[in-house]
Regions:
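Residue-level recognition of conserved beta-strand positions in structured domain cores
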Residues: 36, 49, 60, 68-70, ...
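A short beta-strand-loop-beta hairpin characteristic of the jelly-roll/cupin
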Residues: 54-80
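Short strand-connecting beta-turns/loops that link adjacent beta-strands
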Residues: 28, 52, 71, 99-100
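Short beta-strand His + acidic residue motifs that chelate non-heme Fe in jelly-roll/DSBH
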Residues: 46-47, 66-67, 75, 86, ...
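Conserved short histidine dyad/triad with adjacent acidic residue
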Residues: 35-51
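Ligand-binding loop in jelly-roll beta-barrel domains
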Residues: 79-80, 88-114
Length: 114
């Protein structure tokens, strides 16, 4: 089992590949999933929640905004080096309003429930 990756290529399998984003999940560990999302310029993730699941976002490339809390929460800026903690069940969305694609990695426990 490979244990070391770069922050721009976490390995794993493609979960979604469409005109909004490319998502890959690495399920090499028993209790955590590491997911990588390339969010294309001008696009946004669908806002969602994970009841019973916390999540950590680590932004690697590109600039944009993120909303955490509820759909009406004020967006805040994110970019390379930003780390965002998503509490259990909190609404969250990433918005790429920058001039290039964004890349961010997420870590969450258990299985993907979204």
């Amino acid at each position: 089992m490979q244990l070391h990756y770069s922050n721009t290529d976490i390995g794993g399998e493609t979960i979604k590949d469409d005109d909004t984003y490319l998502i890959k999940d690495n399920r090499a560990l028993n209790n955590l999933v590491v997911s990588s999302t390339r969010l294309y310029r001008g696009k946004q993730t669908r806002g969602h929640r994970h009841p019973g699941q916390e999540e950590v976002y680590v932004f690697v490339q590109g600039f944009g905004k993120m909303i955490v809390g509820n759909e009406d929460s004020k967006p805040f800026n994110v970019g390379p080096g930003s780390v965002v903690l998503i509490p259990d069940g909190e609404f969250h969305r990433v918005i790429n309003d920058g001039d290039s694609n964004m890349l961010f990695n997420c870590v969450f426990g258990g299985m993907r429930n979204h």
